[in-house]
Amino acid sequence: MVDERDKIILDILSKDARTPFTEIAKILGISETAVRKRVKALEEKGIIEGYTIKINPKKLGYSLVTITGVDTRPEKLFEVAEKLKEFEFVRELYLSSGDHMIMAVIWAKDGEDLADIISNKIGKIDGVTKVCPAIILERLK
């Protein structure tokens, strides 16, 4: 299990994975070695699965980001999901129990690019029955 110190470490690293262990140690009032051991234990337990960065899609020329629901014929669900994983424009992919069977975060250069992605790429995958994009207006958190 994780204790309060571990939770604080996780909170700090989730906001900035590059936070120096010395800084975390000062916040917690423990040694850098203790922080290092705790982080290693969290990694070994699978609580920390990896480290990532936040990318600003607009700075790379992608003016549209969508959360897109994709529905499929039930027997094709996993095949469709595997195919979606192959597309570079699909930045995140989830199986869902909500309104749609699959949820994809998609980066598109503009409306024309998004239309092409929906109609000619996702919509043409065998088993896809519905594609429902929702354009993100602003990231709040």
From Swiss-Prot:
SUPFAM superfamilies: Dimeric alpha+beta barrel, Winged helix' DNA-binding domain. Residues 2-63 form the HTH asnC-type domain. Residues 21-40 bind DNA. Keywords: DNA-binding, Repressor, Transcription, Transcription regulation. CDD domains: HTH_ARSR. GO terms for molecular function: sequence-specific DNA binding. Gene3D superfamilies: 3.30.70.920, Winged helix-like DNA-binding domain superfamily/Winged helix DNA-binding domain. It holds the Pfam family HTH_24. InterPro entries: ArsR-like_HTH (IPR011991), AsnC-type_HTH_dom (IPR000485), Dimeric_a/b-barrel (IPR011008), HTH-LrpA_regulator (IPR053456), HTH-Siroheme_Decarb (IPR050684), Tscrpt_reg_AsnC-like (IPR019888), Tscrpt_reg_AsnC/Lrp_C (IPR019887), Tscrpt_reg_HTH_AsnC-type_CS (IPR019885). DNA-binding protein that negatively regulates its own transcription. Interferes with RNA polymerase (RNAP) recruitment by inhibiting the association of RNAP with the TBP-TFB promoter complex. Homooctamer; tetramer of dimers. This is HTH-type transcriptional regulator LrpA.
